[in-house]
């Protein structure tokens, strides 16, 4: 699979060079987009930015807004997912102005919603809420029930992060009511997961467990990462209530899903959580085996928690050594 991907990338690079040599703008634009798509499919979104920026520069020469808008939005999404909030906002703002000029309220509502996510990422809560409400107003005027519910969910997230829990619960409740009416199972599962997380942070373990179970019952197999996140949360709650076997079962199911989808970063989080349970049960060797996997992933992906995870490994190792010494 990797070899095929490398061959495709080499082929697209050759196409780009030919298009540049012949000054074929249309072919160059198509090849740059293909390259960006390949990088995204390979799980290398950062590398997709360079060809998209070149593509946007080409499109700017003709000022064709219809072709510029998708590129601006895609670039904005890539920057946003990497924490490049300011870049994302600038790109979204340009796209939104073009959408407004074209009278495309549906697209505007979606873009303004993305701007709210960027403000939320920057912890600019008031700006995030203002932007979400602008998107909400547009979506309500368009009769977009699923979109309205999503924005109420996002507003709930902001309120939860501000520790305004009653306001968060109210927003999540509005989101769920609309999602149930619209039979939006995916949206319901997402809002229920956020509700569960809110109860979890408040130490309301029973409520969190109920919400996680409701969330998982609605989730299909087509979204393994969301399902794994809910299972990881459920595992944490079970651990807090003393159900260590249940916690490990939830973590193991989450780990299977993440490993199957190649999500190494989130796999390391679940492995770490499992290791802590084995440490709590004085199962030092099992804990060390799991922490070795965590550290291996940390090194492979350059994770900033490597030093901290190595300290956990040494702590557990010292407990094993102490147990050995006590039995000698």
Predicted regions and their residues:
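Conserved alpha-helical positions within TPR/SEL1-like repeat arrays
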Residues: 27-41, 66-81, 106-121, 146-161, ...
């Amino acid at each position: 699979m990797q070899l095929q991907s490398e061959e495709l990338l080499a082929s697209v690079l050759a196409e780009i060079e030919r298009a540049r040599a012949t000054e074929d703008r249309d072919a160059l634009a198509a090849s740059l987009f293909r390259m960006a798509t390949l990088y995204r499919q390979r799980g290398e979104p950062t590398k997709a930015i360079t060809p998209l920026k070149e593509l946007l520069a080409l499109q700017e020469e003709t000022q064709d807004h219809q072709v510029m808008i998708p590129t601006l939005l895609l670039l904005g999404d890539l920057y946003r997912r990497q924490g490049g909030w300011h870049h994302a906002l600038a790109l979204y703002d340009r796209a939104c102005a073009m959408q407004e000029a074209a009278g495309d309220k549906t697209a505007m509502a979606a873009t303004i919603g993305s701007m709210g996510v960027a403000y939320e990422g920057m912890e600019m809560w008031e700006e995030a809420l203002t932007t979400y409400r602008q998107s909400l107003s547009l979506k309500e005027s368009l009769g977009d029930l699923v979109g309205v519910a999503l924005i109420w969910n996002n507003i709930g997230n902001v309120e939860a992060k501000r520790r305004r829990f009653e306001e968060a619960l109210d927003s999540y409740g509005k989101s769920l009511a609309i999602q149930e009416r619209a039979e939006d199972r995916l949206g319901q599962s997402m809002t229920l997961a956020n509700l569960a997380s809110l109860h979890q942070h408040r130490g309301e373990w029973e409520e969190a467990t109920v919400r996680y179970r409701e969330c998982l019952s609605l989730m299909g197999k087509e979204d393994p990462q969301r399902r794994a996140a809910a299972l990881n949360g459920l595992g944490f709650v079970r651990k807090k209530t003393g159900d260590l076997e249940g916690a490990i079962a939830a973590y193991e199911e989450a780990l299977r899903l993440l490993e199957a989808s190649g999500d190494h970063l989130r796999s390391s989080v679940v492995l770490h959580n499992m290791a802590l349970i084995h440490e709590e049960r004085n199962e030092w060797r099992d804990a060390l085996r799991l922490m070795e996997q965590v550290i291996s992933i940390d090194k492979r992906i350059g994770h900033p928690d490597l030093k901290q995870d190595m300290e956990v490994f040494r702590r557990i190792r010292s407990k094993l050594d102490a147990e050995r010494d006590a039995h000698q």
